[in-house]
């Protein structure tokens, strides 16, 4: 019996090295469409989480979004990407608060970006300034130990695509 649904509105960036994230094009769900989905889920008695998720238009997996650790003139920069990513996340944090959503998941499988601890801590603090519910982050399988800022979120999440025959062992790691 299901009682919780995660809705994942998408943002798009051209490549893994693009700094701008678009979440208002025809290729993304509109706010009105998302609000309709939230209302419908609540009518069914379900609790709702929003997981705004960025993807690359060229098909590169979002885990590979990556830039130089040091700013280099004429190269894409983490600071610009996180500025755009924060705008994207805060848009949905405000919508989540407006709609009475229970949880905001601040990212999904952003493996290369996870090392940017200061930026993630600031993002999560910014989300908390706009949203009163639970805040989570969803890392990729086998990457849980690399996230040094788990203490900043309320719920730890991992995309555990583990073999069924080894499920119990994977839960014990």
Language-model segments: what does each one mean?
Residues 64, 81-84, 123, 152-153, ...:
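Enriched - but not universal
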Residues 3-19, 32-113:
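Substrate-binding cleft and catalytic face of glycoside hydrolase catalytic domains
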Residues 88, 98, 103, 114-137:
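Active-site neighborhood of glycoside hydrolase catalytic domains
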Residues 24-29, 80:
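Short coil/turn segments at secondary-structure boundaries
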Residues 29-31, 36-47, 51, 129, ...:
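Glycoside hydrolase catalytic-domain groove-lining segments
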Residues 57-59, 117, 167:
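Short, function-defining helix-loop hinge/capping sites that tune catalysis or transport
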Residues 17-26, 168-171:
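Short, flexible/disordered intra-domain loops and linkers
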Residues 23-24, 66-69, 123, 153-156:
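Short, hinge-like loop/turn segments at secondary-structure boundaries
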């Amino acid at each position: 019996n299901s009682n919780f649904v995660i809705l994942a509105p998408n943002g798009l960036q051209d490549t893994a090295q693009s700094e701008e994230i678009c979440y208002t094009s025809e290729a993304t769900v509109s706010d009105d469409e998302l609000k309709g989905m939230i209302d419908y889920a609540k009518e069914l008695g379900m609790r709702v989480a929003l997981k705004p998720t960025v993807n690359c238009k060229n098909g590169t997996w979002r885990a590979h979004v990556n830039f130089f650790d040091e700013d280099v003139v004429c190269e894409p920069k983490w600071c610009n990407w996180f500025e755009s990513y924060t705008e994207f996340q805060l848009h949905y944090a405000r919508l989540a608060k407006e709609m009475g959503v229970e949880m905001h998941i601040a990212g999904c499988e952003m493996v290369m970006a996870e090392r940017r601890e200061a930026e993630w801590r600031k993002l999560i603090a910014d989300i908390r300034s706009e949203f009163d519910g639970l805040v989570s982050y969803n890392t990729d399988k086998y990457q849980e130990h690399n996230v040094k800022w788990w203490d900043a979120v309320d719920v730890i999440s991992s995309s555990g695509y583990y073999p069924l025959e080894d499920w119990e062992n994977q839960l014990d790691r």
